[in-house]
Amino acid sequence: MKISISNKNVYVVSDIHNDADGFKKLLKEIAFTDDDILIIDGDIFDRGDKPIELYFEILKHPNIYVIQGNHDVWVKREIKEKFGNQKVGEYISYNTVSIMEKRLTPVDMLNIADWINQKPYYIELVLDDKLFHIAHAQVYVTTENVLDKQKIYMGDAHYDDFINGKNETYEGIAIVGHTATEDRKIWKSTSGRTIRIDCGNGYKCYNSRGFLAAIRLNDMKEFYV
């Protein structure tokens, strides 16, 4: 997906992991308005205990873009298999579907799967003449031509080199989540062209240290809750 934006603040957050309360706090922290843009860089779902509340909070904001992460793909596949009798791929089952099915109808569940399925695997963003590649795990010189989408939301054999800033063959700046940073702060490569924004929020439900982090692409200001 390619978009061009000018004269708007653009924020990116990833790996929310069912943390509806943390997400609402983050929106307040960045003073999010209808004139801003927020991109969720994958992994809305799993681990935390409020997937429904998070889903409906996201739906309130037409100026939020969503990218599919591996946990979102797995939730989509599990729903389609359990409620649509469709085997559409392998998945790892966490807690999201079991929480949702207690409160939502099968039709509602399938609507969520369809909503996830409509989301892109990456966004190529031009913001005031600056180029950004935003994907859950890994970007490529021509991400749109990658046939195996799992490489985008899970990474490939060169993933470790990529997240350490050793494979910056693309133009512009890459923004990714997926793997939590070691110090739970937003990480930037020496060149500044690879930026990792998963700061371990998904592990807080296991009583582990982590933050929900966002970066404002206009000036690279960081926000944490």
Please describe what each predicted stretch is.
Residues 190, 194-225:
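Binuclear metal-dependent phosphoesterase catalytic core
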Residues 51-55, 60-124, 129-130, 161-162:
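Active-site neighborhood of divalent metal-dependent phosphoester bond hydrolases
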Residues 13-14, 38-42, 66-70, 135, ...:
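Active-site neighborhood of phospho(di)ester-bond hydrolases with catalytic His/Asp-centered motifs
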Residues 17-21, 46-49, 72-76, 141-142, ...:
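Active-site environment of divalent metal-dependent phosphoester hydrolases
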Residues 9, 13, 18-87:
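Core catalytic region of metal-dependent phosphoesterases/phosphodiesterases
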Residues 32-33, 58-61, 165-169, 187-191:
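Short, conserved loop/helix-junction motifs that constitute active-site signature segments
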Residues 4, 13, 24, 31-32, ...:
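Catalytic phosphate/metal-binding cores of nucleic-acid and nucleotide-processing enzymes, i.e., regions
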Residues 2-11, 124-133:
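Beta-strand-turn-beta hairpins that frame and shape the catalytic cleft
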